[in-house]
């Protein structure tokens, strides 16, 4: 089994190459997608200003109040059904889901989160409608049909919750006992010193999170990759805008993170 995460940067630029490559893997894959840029577009049309939280360690996340959650659900619903419809045109039976559907992804709402304000001070703020994943029902994600999963979960109280897409992809990979987790974005892999790093161990990936050369979403990807690699899941960070991007990743392209070299 493999898990393919289609990052928001790919979704908002051109997801066609990934989608065209998916039929080859339809009987042994689960797809997870993002789409933050479309969320921002929907929010703008609703007159809502996107807000972000910076956490200790430098990780950044979207602040999700109720109005933001509504925009998030709308955007992710569109992306999800766009992917499913595109796969249908290629002869692939696909089922688009959020984590709330069939209760496939459960999460606990983060009531409070620790953030760093603009003055560099740490403080605790309301967590909004953001969840920490507690359970993935792997049996419901097994193909056929090919499952396409949006990064939304459901709480025990029936709340829809925004969950991090990379974290969701990792939890799905762990749940379905995947051999490989392919994280597709708009870069060729992890760049250090201006060059793509072809291979890393889990330990090396963890150490690089603290590097000033690793920023933004790549920090989170490396943290998830290190955790997955320790469980024996090979993680590949690769370019989803390339020709046959899944083939390319599985055949040595991008940055490969494993437990040991």
From Swiss-Prot:
The record's InterPro entries line, in alphabetical order, gives: AceGlu_kinase-like_sf, AcgluKinase_fam, Asp/Glu/Uridylate_kinase, LysZ
Name any Gene Ontology BP term. Answer: lysine biosynthetic process via aminoadipic acid
Question: Please, which domain of life does this record's source organism belong to?
Answer: Archaea
Quote the subcellular location field of this record: Cytoplasm
At which residues is there a site annotated Transition state stabilizer?
5, 221
Q: Which UniProt keywords apply?
A: Amino-acid biosynthesis, Arginine biosynthesis, ATP-binding, Cytoplasm, Kinase, Lysine biosynthesis, Nucleotide-binding, Transferase
Functional description taken from the UniProt entry: Involved in both the arginine and lysine biosynthetic pathways. Phosphorylates the LysW-bound precursors glutamate (for arginine biosynthesis), respectively alpha-aminoadipate (for lysine biosynthesis).
What protein name does the entry list?
A: Putative [LysW]-aminoadipate/[LysW]-glutamate kinase
């Amino acid at each position: 089994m493999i898990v393919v995460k289609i990052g928001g940067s790919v979704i908002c630029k051109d997801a066609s190459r990934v989608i065209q490559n998916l039929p080859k893997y339809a009987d042994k894959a689960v797809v997870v997608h993002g789409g933050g840029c479309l969320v921002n577009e929907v929010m703008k049309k609703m007159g809502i200003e996107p807000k972000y939280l910076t956490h200790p360690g430098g990780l950044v996340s979207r602040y999700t109040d109720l109005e933001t959650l509504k925009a998030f659900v709308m955007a992710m619903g569109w992306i999800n059904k766009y992917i499913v419809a595109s796969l249908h045109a290629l002869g692939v039976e696909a089922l688009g889901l959020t984590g709330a559907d069939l209760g496939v992804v459960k999460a606990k709402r983060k009531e409070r989160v620790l953030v760093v304000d603009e003055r560099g001070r740490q403080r605790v703020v309301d967590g909004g409608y953001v969840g920490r994943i507690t359970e993935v029902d792997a049996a419901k994600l097994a193909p056929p049909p090919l499952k396409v999963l949006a990064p939304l979960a459901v709480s025990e109280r029936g709340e829809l919750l925004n969950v991090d897409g990379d974290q969701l992809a990792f939890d799905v990979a762990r749940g379905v006992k995947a051999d490989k987790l392919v994280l597709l974005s708009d870069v060729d892999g992890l760049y250090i010193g201006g060059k793509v790093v072809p291979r890393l161990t889990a330990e090396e990936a963890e150490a690089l999170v603290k590097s000033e050369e690793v920023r933004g979403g790549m920090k989170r990807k490396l943290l998830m990759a290190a955790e997955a690699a320790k469980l024996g899941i090979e993680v590949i960070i690769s370019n989803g805008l390339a020709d046959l991007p899944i083939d390319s990743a599985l055949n040595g392209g991008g940055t490969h993170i494993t437990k040991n070299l």
